[in-house]
Amino acid sequence: MVNAITSGDILSAEQIKRHSKVYAGPGAGKTYFLVENVKNIIMTNETVAKSRARKVLCITYTNAAVDEIRRRLEKYVDYVEAYTIHGFIIEHIIKPFQEELINIIKSDFDISVSKKGMISSQIEGLGILHGIDKEEIYNFIKSTNPGQFDSDAFNYSKKIMGEVEVDNDLFLKSKIAGEELIHKIKASSKIKEDHVIPLKQYVWSVVRKLTHNEILYFGYRILENNPTALYALRVKFPFIFVDEFQDTNPLQTLLVKLIGQKSTQIMVVGDIAQSIYSFQGAKPSDLND
């Protein structure tokens, strides 16, 4: 059973034992609801109050919103963590489970990546190949893919290098709903375009960065593939609040639902009439599901 409440409510002791959906329009105090309910859980729920190893997780969709939540909950810093969805995945899934990430890159894309060095996220606002000499890329590709990447392919790839951070459109489309998205990714990952796969090998092996779409994809795949990773998150975060849920794209929704299948209670807060990230494939209707 799922609670369906308004942003004026404080969740009762019984309600926090179930997943909750909070409907609130613009200016209805969604952040206030989130902050006050986090405080209530910290002060009244023994699972969190008596163990600083177990925390309330807040996920929202802008760095400014993260800063605001952290500011309002500053006194409770030992009991709560706040991130954007990408920040959460990097910190709690990608970084701790690097070996699993490398194995999934191999199994899903048939690309071998060395275990030397941390694979993390690109710097916000910069292309993933920002500041890297194209000849360095060419020499790497020639050495690792002899005979598979000729000069014509390289000349073509140079035209798209400025777009490598979004070349996931070739096999990481996020405009497809639910499980269909995962099947689409897995199916099209078998494509071996000479100008894409070697570049991806360079980015993942040498630059060691993931694009925003890749963070979502690999975060989900690690949890799907590694019960230990999933269990660790459920133990650490018995309560998760997701703000602006109407802006959640299908892969983000799948990830949150996966965590919430056992133990962890999910509270989603949103307004189905207002989606500022619809270009990412966000489905406001997920708030009703």
Regions of interest found by a model, annotated:
Residues M1-I102, Y231:
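P-loop NTPase Walker
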Residues V2-I5, D194-F241, N249-L255:
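Conserved helicase/translocase P-loop NTPase motor core
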Residues I41, I89, F245-V256, S275-Y277:
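Catalytic P-loop NTPase motifs of RecA-like helicase/translocase cores
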Residues T60, Y76-P96, I191-Y220:
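Inter-Walker segment of RecA-like/P-loop motor cores
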Residues N103-W204:
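Coupling/switch/interface segments within P-loop NTPase motor domains and analogous charged loops
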Residues L255-D289:
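Conserved RecA-like helicase ATPase core segment
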